[in-house]
């Protein structure tokens, strides 16, 4: 069994940080020579030039570059609030996607430009659009540890149980990033404590696979199910044992929890 679990653990370690994990702070990699004048002005926040270009018939407010980015995408990624407001006044498409299916809202949240994200939400941006990895704006907000952005997105009916390509809900993203405060916050907002990823790993299983003490205590307080198994049949207790988390039985006992294995 040790050999089987060791193989499965190695396999999952490579998958727990996959291309589907939302990463924050990543703006667009821009080469000036590849940008049209309109996009260049939006990316640097030059509102004066942007207005001049849009007065010319050859420029359209929704013009896309080779990677399907609009001026709104670039303004949101770079935090140019005044440009975002102007483009919306010009009736730009607010939910348009780039080559990675990212909407301007997703890009604003990913780059932690909260002012831009707030404007977009107030103007009707869809908080539940998914990028090519099925991450929503909420996944990125959780990864960026922005409680105010998470709160805003939930106020605009962001899906708390949305799953990316790995099956991670925002709660599971918070667990993987070892962020007890965000985990607690999401649970208080009604996140499913027993949600599981594509390998049927629950928050508790993922928690005992990392730096578990605070997270495990928190999840136990929330009544997490102890008997859930991953696709190989392992429970959180078995993950804890093989990861050297030897106090797990004491933790469950101290919270009055008994194991009822299915």
Curated annotation (Swiss-Prot):
InterPro entries: Ankyrin_repeat_domain (IPR050657), Ankyrin_rpt (IPR002110), Ankyrin_rpt-contain_sf (IPR036770). The lineage of its organism: Eukaryota, Metazoa, Chordata, Craniata, Vertebrata. ANK repeats lie at residues 67-96, 100-129, 133-162, 166-195, 199-228. The gene is ANKRD7. Pfam families: Ank_2, Ank_5. Keywords: ANK repeat, Repeat. It comes from Macaca fascicularis. This is Ankyrin repeat domain-containing protein 7. PROSITE patterns: ANK_REP_REGION, ANK_REPEAT.
């Amino acid at each position: 069994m040790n050999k089987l679990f060791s193989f499965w653990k190695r396999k999952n370690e490579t998958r727990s940080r996959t291309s589907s994990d939302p990463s924050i702070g990543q703006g667009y990699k821009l080469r000036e020579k590849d940008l049209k004048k309109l996009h260049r002005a939006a990316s640097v926040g030059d509102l004066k030039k942007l207005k001049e270009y849009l007065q010319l018939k050859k420029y359209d407010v929704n013009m896309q570059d080779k990677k399907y980015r609009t001026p709104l995408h670039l303004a949101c990624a770079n935090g140019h609030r005044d440009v975002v407001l102007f483009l919306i006044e010009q009736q730009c498409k607010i939910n348009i996607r780039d080559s990675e299916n990212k909407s301007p809202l997703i890009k604003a949240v990913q780059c932690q430009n909260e002012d831009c994200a707030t404007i977009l939400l107030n103007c009707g941006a869809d908080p539940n659009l998914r990028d090519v990895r099925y991450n929503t704006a909420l996944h990125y907000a959780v990864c960026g540890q922005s409680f105010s952005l998470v709160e805003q997105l939930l106020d605009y009916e962001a899906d708390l149980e949305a799953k990316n390509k790995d099956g991670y809900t925002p709660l599971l993203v918070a667990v993987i990033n070892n962020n007890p405060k965000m985990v607690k916050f999401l649970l208080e907002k009604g996140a499913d404590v027993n949600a599981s990823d594509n390998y049927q790993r629950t928050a508790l299983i993922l928690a005992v696979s990392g730096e578990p003490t605070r997270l495990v205590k928190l999840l136990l307080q929330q009544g997490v199910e102890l008997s859930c198994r991953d696709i190989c049949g392992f429970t959180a207790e078995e993950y804890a044992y093989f990861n050297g988390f030897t106090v797990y039985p004491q933790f469950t006992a101290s919270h009055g929890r008994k194991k009822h294995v299915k």
